[in-house]
């Protein structure tokens, strides 16, 4: 930009400072959420939740699919896909194998659930959109919260539908 004659060295410094000041709160929120949910995972919080949920469904295929959705929704509260897969897949894949369910169904349900939770204010897509719009991520999230609630209902419905398909498959 400098060598092309668009900006001077002084302007580049101002642009960098402006960029950091506008994205700083977003970055801080993201770092906090990753650290917090990482600590909660290491502390075994999700193991307790998964154990309690699986006691409810036992060998019900539709129930396992719904629990997969709920676990993915809880696991994706941090907005990070990698951590969600580290929670959902190790917990649910043995159950799916034991019940002769397809691993693709596990992934499909998890990804649908994760897509809905990507609207959380600390998730990457919402933070980027808020930064571009020049508003706080929480303010943006409040406007899309009803859409997210509908998305959660649709994710649960998709889990039930996938469970019915798996049940018919045998």
Positions of PLM-derived features:
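Membrane-core helix-loop-helix motifs of multi-pass transport proteins
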Residues: 94-170
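Short loop/turn hinge sites at secondary-structure boundaries
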Residues: 4-6, 170
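Membrane-embedded alpha-helical segments and adjacent helix-loop junctions characteristic
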Residues: 7-97
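Hydrophobic alpha-helical membrane segments of integral membrane proteins
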Residues: 1, 81-88, 105-109
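Proteins with a high burden of low-complexity, intrinsically disordered sequence enriched in S/T/G/P/A and R
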Residues: 2-3, 15-23, 141, 157-161
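Small-residue-rich segments of transmembrane alpha-helices in multi-pass membrane proteins
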Residues: 2-4, 27, 65-66, 114-124
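Short glycine-rich loop/turn motifs that provide flexible caps or phosphate-binding loops at active sites
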Residues: 3-4, 43, 133
């Amino acid at each position: 930009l400098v060598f092309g004659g668009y900006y001077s060295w002084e302007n580049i410094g101002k642009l960098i400072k402006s960029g950091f000041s506008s994205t700083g709160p977003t970055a801080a929120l993201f770092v906090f959420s990753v650290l917090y949910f990482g600590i909660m995972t290491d502390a075994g919080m999700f193991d307790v939740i998964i154990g309690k949920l699986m006691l409810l469904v036992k060998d019900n295929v539709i129930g396992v699919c719904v629990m997969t959705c709920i676990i993915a929704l809880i696991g994706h509260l941090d907005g990070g896909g990698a951590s969600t897969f580290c929670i959902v897949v190790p917990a649910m894949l043995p159950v799916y194998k034991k019940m002769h369910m397809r691993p693709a169904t596990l992934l499909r349900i998890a990804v649908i659930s994760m897509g809905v939770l990507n609207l959380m204010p600390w998730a990457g897509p919402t933070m980027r959109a808020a930064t571009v719009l020049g508003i706080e991520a929480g303010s943006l999230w409040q406007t899309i919260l009803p859409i997210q609630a509908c998305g959660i209902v649709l994710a649960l419905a998709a889990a039930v539908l996938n469970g019915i398909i798996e049940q018919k498959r045998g």
